[in-house]
Amino acid sequence: ERFAADYERESGQISVPEIKEKNGIKIAVIGSGPAGLSFAGDMAKYGYDVTVFEALHEIGGVLKYGIPEFRLPNKVVDVEIDNLAKMGVNFIKDCIIGKTISVEQLEEEGFKGVFVASGAGLPNFMNIPGENSINILSSNEYLTRVNLMDAASEDSDTPVPFGKNVAVIGGGNTAMDSVRTARRLGAERAMIIYRRSEEEMPARIEEVKHAKEEGVEFLTLHNPIEYIADELGKVKQVILQKIELGEPDASGRRSPVAIP
């Protein structure tokens, strides 16, 4: 499937699916991530007049801001977006539904349906001492600034810190994307800190494998309990607590238990 898709894209002869006759019904899609784009494509095939509203300045949602170029090149995403445009899907960027325009205004403009695909963009923090220190970022902010705002450039208006020692808390795919990005930005020592064992990591096996091949260190069965900042307020140290695994929790994985 990957070979066929790449061949079609590189040949420039991309097929557009059959579109039913336009029915004149306007549908609004809030968000241009995977769910929004998939829904837009399906509705367009059935003849609906679809408009996708994106809050950011790039169409693609998490496909653009959350997944690094080395894992999903933007040009691949852009081809899919171009296909949707050829199918008749309209795209409006820099538009926040509820602020730039209201749902009531969409209804006044004739939209008969609204599909909310805004994603789960709010990060979860641990609420531990020192968490507000300078250079502590959520993966969401870090990847967005690097992937979408060119924050790795010295001329960027929103530069990210180029830490020589970088710790990423968590063991999912987003954690792997973050730590591998840090390595590419020059981190001499990049480490995953995870409260369970490697077997319980939710990240895909191949993502863990690639991270190890790139020199990422893994410290499992440890969890941060405090961050220490220097006199300028920049994080310089993290205090960890050792963890052991107890009985399985609701996720089916063994629950982390702090060792006194």
Spans of features found by a protein language model:
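Iron-sulfur cluster-binding cysteine motifs and their immediate structural context
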Residues: 1-5, 51, 55-58, 88-91
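A short, basic/flexible loop-to-alpha-helix module at the beginning of a structural domain
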Residues: 8-27, 144-164
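N-terminal Rossmann-like FAD-binding beta1-loop-alpha1 element of flavoenzymes
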Residues: 25-52, 174-183
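Conserved beta-strand elements of the Class I
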Residues: 28-30, 167, 191
